[in-house]
Curated annotation (Swiss-Prot):
One Pfam family of this chain: Phe_tRNA-synt_N
InterPro entries on file: aa-tRNA-synth_II, aa-tRNA-synth_II/BPL/LPL, Phe-tRNA-synth_IIc_asu, Phe-tRNA_ligase_II_N, Phe_tRNA_ligase_alpha1_bac, Phenylalanyl-tRNA_Synthase, tRNA-bd_arm
Top class in the EC scheme: ligase
Sites where the protein binds Mg(2+): 261
Protein name listed in UniProt: Phenylalanine--tRNA ligase alpha subunit
Catalytic activity: tRNA(Phe) + L-phenylalanine + ATP = L-phenylalanyl-tRNA(Phe) + AMP + diphosphate + H(+)
Signal peptide (residue range): none
Comment on bound cofactor: Binds 2 magnesium ions per tetramer.
Keyword Cytoplasm in annotation: yes
Subunit structure of this chain's protein: Tetramer of two alpha and two beta subunits.
Length: 344
C-alpha cells in the first residue's frame, strides 16, 4: 500500500509541476483532493486498516503527502497566476496619446439586483428581514436542524471548519442561512407569527461551472398555529410568478431534507419538455421545533431555501457561475443594472 502511495505522490508532483495553466492545475487538484479524489480516498480508507502500527505508518505518510501536495499546488498556483498577470499586462498596453474618455457610471452587480428583487417580493408578503453570523457553531448549523452526526453535509470535504475550537465547540462557515432561522426561533419569546427571510453568504467546499465555495442564499420561515402545505404552495407560487413572470409553469416534487417533513423540491419549466430545479422547501420538522422550545402540537410552519446565483443564472441566461466573481468589467457592464434598480 505504501508503494502505491509513494507512486501516487511522485505522479501528482510531476503533474503539478508540468502544468502550465490554472485550469489544468484546478483539474489536478480536483482529481487528487476532490470528494472522490485519490488522496481523499486514501484518507478515508486509513480507518479500515486493522493493524494498528500499519495504520499509524500509513496515516503519517498519507498526511505528510497531503500537506506537501497542498503546499505545492498553492505555490504553483501563485506562480501561474503571476505569469497570467504578466501576460495580461503585456496585452493591455495603453496608448497614452489617445484622448481621455468620459467617466462611466458603474452598474449594480446582478447578484445584488436579484437579492433586492427577492427581498422586495417577500417583504410584500409580510416577511421581515433577519441576519446572523457567518461563523457558526455546529448546533445552529446542523444539530438543531435534525442533521445527524453521520450526515454527508458534515464531512470536512463538504464543509469548511475552523481549526480552533470556541467554547470547546467546532466552528463552521455556515452552509445555509437556516442557522438564522434557528436563532430567530430561539429568541422569539413566545411572539407569533414568526415570519422571516434570511439572506446572506453561505459556504460549501465545491467549485465548478455551477458551484462556488461561497454563494448567496435566502431562506424563509413562517411559524404560527395551523400553518399547512397550502400556505407554503401559495407563497412559493406567488414568488416564482413575481420573479419569473405570470406564465411560468411550476411543479412540486416529493423530496427529503432532515429539517422538513414533508419535503419538496420545486421546478419550473424552461423549454417544451425541460424542467429545472429552483428551490427546496417543506413543513418544519417537529424535531426542529422541539430543539428550539416550540411546541409542535400547537405550532407548525414551513421553510424554504433559494440559491440566488441559481435563479439569477436562469433569469438572465448566465451559463457559468464563476463569472459572477471574476471582476470582469466588460461582463459586469453587460449583465449589470443601472443604479436606479437599487431600491428595496
Amino acid at each position: 500500500m505504501l508503494d502505491n502511495i509513494h507512486n501516487l505522490h511522485k505522479e501528482a508532483t510531476d503533474k503539478i509541476l508540468s502544468t502550465s495553466s490554472l485550469e489544468e492545475l484546478e483539474n489536478i487538484r480536483s482529481a487528487y483532493f476532490g470528494k472522490s479524489g485519490f488522496i481523499t480516498v486514501y484518507l478515508r480508507n486509513i480507518s479500515t486498516i486493522k493493524n494498528l502500527e500499519e495504520r499509524k505508518s500509513v496515516g503519517n505518510v498519507v498526511n505528510t503527502i497531503y500537506s506537501e501536495l497542498k503546499s505545492l499546488i498553492n505555490s504553483h498556483r501563485t506562480k501561474l497566476h503571476q505569469i497570467q498577470i504578466d501576460n495580461q499586462l503585456l496585452q493591455d498596453k495603453v496608448d497614452i496619446s489617445l484622448p481621455i474618455r468620459p467617466q462611466k457610471i458603474g452598474k449594480l452587480h446582478p447578484i445584488s439586483n436579484v437579492l433586492n428583487e427577492v427581498k422586495r417580493i417577500f417583504l410584500s408578503l409580510g416577511f421581515k428581514l433577519y441576519d446572523g453570523p457567518e461563523l457558526e457553531d455546529e448546533f445552529h448549523v446542523f444539530d438543531a436542524l435534525n442533521t445527524n452526526k453521520n450526515h454527508p453535509a458534515r464531512e470536512e470535504n463538504d464543509t469548511f471548519y475552523l481549526k480552533t475550537l470556541v467554547n470547546n465547540k467546532r466552528v463552521v462557515l455556515r452552509t445555509h442561512t437556516s442557522s438564522v432561522q434557528i436563532r430567530t426561533m430561539e429568541n422569539n419569546d413566545g411572539i407569533y407569527p414568526i415570519k422571516v427571510i434570511a439572506p446572506g453568504k453561505v459556504y460549501r467546499n465545491d467549485w465548478d461551472a455551477t458551484h462556488s465555495p461561497m454563494f448567496h442564499q435566502i431562506e424563509g420561515l413562517y411559524i404560527d398555529k395551523n400553518i399547512n402545505m397550502g400556505h407554503l404552495k401559495y407563497c412559493i407560487n406567488y414568488f416564482l410568478n413575481k420573479f419569473f413572470g405570470k406564465n411560468v409553469q411550476i411543479r412540486f416534487r416529493n423530496s427529503y431534507f432532515p429539517f422538513t417533513e414533508p419535503s419538496a423540491e420545486v421546478d419550473i419549466k424552461c423549454n417544451q419538455n425541460d424542467w429545472i430545479e429552483i428551490l427546496g422547501c417543506g413543513m418544519v420538522h417537529s424535531n426542529v421545533l422541539t430543539n428550539v422550545n416550540i411546541d409542535p402540537n400547537q405550532y407548525s410552519g414551513f421553510a424554504f431555501g433559494i440559491g440566488i446565483e441559481r435563479i439569477t443564472m436562469l433569469k438572465y441566461n448566465i451559463s457559468d457561475l464563476r463569472k459572477f466573481y471574476t471582476n470582469n468589467l466588460q461582463w459586469l457592464d453587460h449583465y449589470g443594472f443601472h443604479f436606479t434598480h437599487l431600491t428595496i
